[in-house]
Regions:
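Acidic, Mg2+-coordinating catalytic module of metal-dependent nucleases/exonucleases
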Residues: 210-231
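Conserved beta-strand scaffold positions in the cores of enzyme catalytic domains, especially
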Residues: 18-22, 85, 156
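A residue-level signal for conserved active-site and pocket-lining positions in enzyme catalytic cores
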Residues: 23, 55, 89, 99, ...
Length: 233
């Protein structure tokens, strides 16, 4: 099961033959120096992912060969972020449609999972996006769907995809600090599982595996369209 310790989701074993005792520095505050406590607080602010693993004790669960190895979790999406817009990936039966709010603070990319569900019609996506009043950068694979959402009053634009566009988006994301809101469970899961593909000999190649990536694809469309100017004319 998951329990929350100082805002960090920590896995606790529930196996009947296991007694899992999880302690942190909060259980020993009276014996810790002010210098140590300040170091821990600084880590919490400046490197929340390290704080989660090293201090609070969340299990390291980034997959081997992970594309994104350094990213953090924050409580809230910053209201002062710039270039705020949605990245939108479309799915239906088996794949979810993902609506990810994205924004920039200095060289940091902030991400907030607003919707992540299967079986959504264009009318459902419109209901999700309309209250925000933000620009949307979307997958260009289904022009009909983009037109329907546009007709619903949404400022939606199709991203320009082509040879090398996947890696271009990934490279730009890796050049930035990435922070994901703590409520964005599906997006966090994708970032942990998103790995480079392997060739027939088991060697990693410069191409990610194409699964568990719907939220990440939505973010990549935002990066391509809003930050790199790759919008279909």
């Amino acid at each position: 099961k998951l329990v929350e310790i100082d805002g960090v989701q920590v896995q606790i074993s529930t196996h009947p033959n296991v007694l899992h005792i999880h302690t942190t520095y909060f259980d020993n505050l009276e014996n810790l120096s002010p210098e140590f406590l300040k170091e821990v607080e600084d880590m919490k602010v400046n490197n929340p992912e390290k704080y989660a693993h090293v201090v609070i004790g969340r299990w390291a669960d980034v997959a081997e060969g992970a594309v994104f190895k350094k990213w953090g979790i924050v409580d809230e999406f910053p209201a002062w972020a710039k270039k705020i817009a949605f990245g939108q990936d479309f799915g239906y039966t088996h794949d979810p449609s993902a609506s990810i709010r994205c924004g920039i603070v200095d060289n940091a990319l902030y991400l907030d999972e607003v919707d992540y569900r299967t079986g959504l019609l264009s009318s459902d996506i419109i209901k999700t996006l309309r209250p925000w009043g933000l620009k949307v950068i979307a997958d260009s694979a289904d022009p009909r769907l983009i037109q329907e959402i546009h007709n619903g009053g949404i400022k939606i634009y199709a991203v320009e995809k082509g040879a090398g566009s996947i890696n271009a988006g990934i490279d730009k994301m890796k050049d930035m600090e990435i922070y994901i809101t703590k409520r964005s469970y599906n997006l966090q899961s994708e970032f942990r599982k998103y790995v480079w593909a392997k060739d027939k000999d088991g060697n990693y190649i410069n191409e990610p595996e194409d699964h568990d990536n719907h939220g990440i694809d939505a973010v990549r469309y935002y990066v391509l369209g809003e930050l790199l100017g790759k919008i279909q004319k």
